[in-house]
Swiss-Prot record:
Gene Ontology terms for molecular function: ATP binding; magnesium ion binding; phosphoribosylformylglycinamidine synthase activity
Protein name in UniProt: Phosphoribosylformylglycinamidine synthase subunit PurL
Compartment(s) where it occurs, according to its Swiss-Prot or TrEMBL record: Cytoplasm
Organism expressing this protein natively: Leptospira interrogans serogroup Icterohaemorrhagiae serovar Lai (strain 56601)
Pathway assigned in UniProt: Purine metabolism; IMP biosynthesis via de novo pathway; 5-amino-1-(5-phospho-D-ribosyl)imidazole from N(2)-formyl-N(1)-(5-phospho-D-ribosyl)glycinamide: step 1/2
Gene name of the record: purL
Alphabetical GO biological process terms: 'de novo' IMP biosynthetic process; purine nucleotide biosynthetic process
Lineage: Bacteria, Pseudomonadati, Spirochaetota, Spirochaetia, Leptospirales
EC number annotated for this UniProt entry: 6.3.5.3
Amino acid sequence: MEKDVVSLEDALEHGLTKEEFQKIQEILGRIPNSTELGIFSAMWSEHCSYKNSILKLKTLPTTSDKLLAKAGEENAGAMDIGDGLAVVFKIESHNHPTAVEPYQGAATGVGGIMRDIFTMGARPIVSLNSLRFGNPDEPKNKYLLSRAVKGIGDYGNSLGIAVSGGELFIDECFSKNPLVNAMTVGIVRHDQMASATTGGQIGNSVYIVGATTGRDGIHGASFASKDLSKESESKRSAVQVGDPFMEKLLMEASLEAIQKGLLVGIQDMGAAGISCATSEMSAKGKTGMKIDLDLVPFRETGMNAYEAMLSESQERMLVVPKKGKESELVSIFEKWNLNAVKIGEVTADGMIEIYMGGKLKAKIPAESLVLGGGAPRYERETKRPSYLDAVKTWKPDEIPDVTKGANSKEILLKILSSWNVCSRKPITEQYDSEVGLVKLIGPGLDGGLSAIPGTNKALATATDCNSRYTYLDPYKGAEFAVCEAARNVYVTGATPYGVTNNLNFANPYIPENYYIFSECIRGMGDACRFLGLPVTGGNVSFYNESPEGPIFPTPTIGMVGILENKEKLIFNFPKEIGVELAVLGNFRPSLGGSEYLKKIHGQINGSIPELDIKEELELCKLILSLNESRILKSAKDLSLGGIAVALSKTVLFSGLGIESDLTSLRRNRLDLTLFGESSTAVLVGFDSLSKEDIRKQTEAYGLKFYPIGKTNSSGILEIKDAEIKISFQELSGPYEKGLEAVFAL
């Protein structure tokens, strides 16, 4: 056993509290040494233990007869999709690393979430990303955004995994603290799913496989569990360095070993590295492990036990093979030119014992380290922020309606050029969306749709959150995020299936921040419960703030859906002339929190769009029912930018013209009609012969039918009541150029 002991000051420097340090001493029956303190600090960090969020997360709905893995019990969520197949999916953040080293920070975020998926035995088929950055007109923000996107593209493209969608949201609050949330979805046969456990197999060998271990990423978990500060720039050593080509080899070798039935368990070495993998696998299998660090393949000389246990070097796995299968395991990894080295064995006493240089460096009960075991759990003080009441006093009559007359056209073009509305092509062109030949509906639209190889099914995917909405109304904003993600799935024709979430918030020790977090959890939970969607897992990222202030609360929703027959997909936009257009649902536009209010009037204020969760469910049922009858030519979610932006995008993506009359949608202000944002509204296209049938079905679901126009061959958008008449070319200029300068070489 190491002779050194640590002090309370050491514990505080490691991010632990006085009470936590006392609890560690009670668990061990003594004062920990430096290696043990490092292990506890990483495993009890917010990033690994969810200590300030787990009690709230347990209120989310997590039950479904389709669930194959309980939330939080495996590396990712898994749901039965029929035919003996499961969809495996998860979203995770890499926010702080991206803030200090955007290329590697974003790239390794992609690599980490990929490993979570193929560690379950699933082959990743698509990925998505949800990004939040500050104004790209500022050089630092432009650098962060452009480098992060390149990191995401380079890593994902090298792995050969298609990008099916994602989102980008720009606001000044993300200038010093960008958000990078990466989601991956894979497919696996039920009988080939793997688990992160020792399986209770006492005496089995423990192998480290994949890349060598270096000093990169040490304290990565702790770094992600603190506020960003001026000193954060010096924490580049806490940012992991990725090698996507190594990851590709690791993926193929791991999947081969799983499919050949060689493994008892397998765990990605992500946050906290060997510390996390050994303790989580042991705790789940109700065993311990004895590990000899001298056997670990190192890439750097002179590494000590503290560094080895906390290294977050990428592209590594911890594996427990079945007895008698060890040599076959090694052969597979050698074939892929990867390390597969025995470093220990499974023990019966429940202890993690770490040796180096022939000496015992750490001895800790596995259960004491893990989420749901001995890791601390807190519910923090809450206080409703005063601004939440202040913003609700704002009324639209405080701003002029600047859309009257010829101004409508000018305003529309400004909104089309805004960071949050303009074309994502400069981003999506850096991602390979064609690899794997699975794309049916690609990135840049409402939701992605991808063929599931070997079946007639398709997988719908979406990520959504309007951070302004959750800032203005945490509860309703989170509800809205769930409903919009569901809408973006079902407008492809797919049935929403399950949710993964990435909860990006500020310091939880500040009562106002914890109130916002709690309300977002409550809103998300209520929406998921009513829509019948289980939350299969996800990620919490606290401490997203800088000396300039906190980010807007961003509970990113990752949604998956299944289309049983991929021939029944619905496109976002019509492809023929003479297609009738109508809005289905309940059009209740609001200027509160809208892109129009921010872009044109420079304000973030007001009440967000009204949402009736019952109507949202009925609208989902309606769209899916109409699609079964094959009478829809197109379906598009109506939200950011309002009806004027939706019609503009229809012209831009279809190349057709539209003659529209918004009388059925008209409100007392023209700007509210054109640019007000609404929940529970979908813009659909259909043949004129189906018009009355669709109207009757819509009304039968208790919803409203708003006819607004028809497509033609002119390539011109005409909105009669707004005196708008704009050609494809006029629309295309500002829309396409919005992000071009950010990514110009």
